[in-house]
């Protein structure tokens, strides 16, 4: 999740303060912005243009949340177990060594969106997270109304979504959630959506040998795929459900592998809000998922 008004205050242009009265000339005091402050994201609820989407943007719209912090996004901080974050260019420059020191074991990083956009911070984030010793993976923000699942899987696999057995690379993620630019299900029927997702999965697996992880909410999956269970035996499931003690899993999946439990987390090395996530298992199981030995 990107930062909103709080970061706008810290990331604005330097302010000049004029002092008068006792001095003949005004004294300008420049307030420098925070070095790693993230850029200001478009407010949820408005159309999100190409390249601007991020993990959770549709979830905010689905839950009727505005631009500022909300108790449903803050929620109880579940800091137990194996912890991680997800990021995009909206988080700005990230100190990945500090993220590791803050106790984060894994990270998912936005790589692509549709078939025309590669996140401009992906390469730096992906490399620096690896060098910091964080197990990381890439995610693709789906635009099912723009092109086929096959075409988008190809674009993702060719632009950061690849996989290798190196102890630090997780399988890629298909981020498919409430359309941030229009109708919830992108104008597709449940049958069309199932086909789109299945095509994406099939092509991604053909390109990488891995089953793509699916990120979404219970509401979106039940509504837009008709509670489809066709991916349950194939894809690890990542559920977004903020501000609760336990997530609701859609009818089509028996359990969750990852849980995005907050969109307003704070982690050393990241300026402003960042999505917080939990892995459903031990550190050894996370490594097994990364290396495809689970």
UniProtKB/Swiss-Prot annotation:
<keyword id="KW-0732">Signal</keyword>
<feature type="active site">
    <location>
        <position position="175"/>
    </location>
</feature>
<feature type="disulfide bond">
    <location>
        <begin position="185"/>
        <end position="224"/>
    </location>
</feature>
<dbReference type="GO" id="GO:0003796">
    <property type="term" value="F:lysozyme activity"/>
</dbReference>
<keyword id="KW-0081">Bacteriolytic enzyme</keyword>
<dbReference type="GO" id="GO:0009253">
    <property type="term" value="P:peptidoglycan catabolic process"/>
</dbReference>
<protein>
    <recommendedName>
        <fullName>Lysozyme M1</fullName>
        <ecNumber>3.2.1.17</ecNumber>
    </recommendedName>
</protein>
<dbReference type="Pfam" id="PF01183">
    <property type="entry name" value="Glyco_hydro_25"/>
</dbReference>
<dbReference type="InterPro" id="IPR017853">
    <property type="entry name" value="Glycoside_hydrolase_SF"/>
</dbReference>
<keyword id="KW-0326">Glycosidase</keyword>
<keyword id="KW-0929">Antimicrobial</keyword>
<dbReference type="InterPro" id="IPR018077">
    <property type="entry name" value="Glyco_hydro_fam25_subgr"/>
</dbReference>
<dbReference type="GO" id="GO:0042742">
    <property type="term" value="P:defense response to bacterium"/>
</dbReference>
<comment type="similarity">
    <text>Belongs to the glycosyl hydrolase 25 family.</text>
</comment>
<keyword id="KW-0378">Hydrolase</keyword>
<dbReference type="GO" id="GO:0005576">
    <property type="term" value="C:extracellular region"/>
</dbReference>
<dbReference type="InterPro" id="IPR008270">
    <property type="entry name" value="Glyco_hydro_25_AS"/>
</dbReference>
<dbReference type="InterPro" id="IPR002053">
    <property type="entry name" value="Glyco_hydro_25"/>
</dbReference>
<keyword id="KW-0964">Secreted</keyword>
<dbReference type="GO" id="GO:0031640">
    <property type="term" value="P:killing of cells of another organism"/>
</dbReference>
<dbReference type="GO" id="GO:0016052">
    <property type="term" value="P:carbohydrate catabolic process"/>
</dbReference>
<feature type="active site">
    <location>
        <position position="86"/>
    </location>
</feature>
<feature type="domain" description="Ch-type lysozyme">
    <location>
        <begin position="81"/>
        <end position="294"/>
    </location>
</feature>
<feature type="active site">
    <location>
        <position position="177"/>
    </location>
</feature>
<comment type="function">
    <text>This enzyme has both lysozyme (acetylmuramidase) and diacetylmuramidase activities.</text>
</comment>
<dbReference type="GO" id="GO:0016998">
    <property type="term" value="P:cell wall macromolecule catabolic process"/>
</dbReference>
<keyword id="KW-1015">Disulfide bond</keyword>
């Amino acid at each position: 999740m990107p930062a909103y008004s709080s970061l706008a205050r810290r990331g604005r242009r330097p302010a000049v303060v004029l002092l008068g009265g006792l001095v003949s000339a005004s004294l300008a005091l420049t307030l420098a912005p925070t070095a790693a402050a993230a850029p200001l994201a478009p407010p949820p609820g408005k159309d999100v243009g190409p390249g601007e989407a991020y993990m959770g943007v549709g979830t905010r719209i689905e839950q009727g949340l505005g631009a500022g912090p909300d108790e449903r996004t803050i929620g109880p901080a579940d800091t137990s177990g194996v912890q991680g974050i997800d990021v995009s260019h909206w988080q700005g420059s990230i100190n990945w060594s500090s993220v590791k020191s803050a106790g984060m074991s894994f990270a998912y990083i936005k790589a692509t969106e549709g078939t025309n956009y590669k996140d401009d911070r992906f390469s730096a984030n992906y490399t620096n997270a690896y060098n910091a010793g964080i197990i990381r993976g890439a995610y693709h923000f789906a635009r099912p109304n723009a092109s086929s699942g096959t075409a988008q899987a190809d674009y993702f696999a060719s632009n950061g979504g690849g996989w290798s057995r190196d102890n630090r690379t997780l399988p890629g993620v298909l981020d498919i959630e409430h359309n941030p630019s229009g109708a919830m299900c992108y104008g597709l029927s449940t049958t069309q959506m199932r086909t789109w997702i299945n095509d994406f999965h099939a092509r991604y697996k053909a390109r990488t040998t891995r089953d793509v992880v699916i990120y979404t909410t219970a509401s979106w999956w039940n509504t837009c795929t008709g509670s489809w269970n066709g991916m349950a035996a194939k894809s690890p499931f990542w559920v977004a459900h903020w501000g609760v003690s336990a997530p609701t899993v859609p009818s089509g999946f028996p359990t969750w592998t990852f849980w995005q439990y907050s969109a307003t987390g704070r982690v050393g090395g990241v300026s402003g809000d960042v999505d917080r996530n939990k892995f459903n298992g031990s550190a050894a199981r996370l490594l097994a998922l990364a290396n495809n030995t689970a």
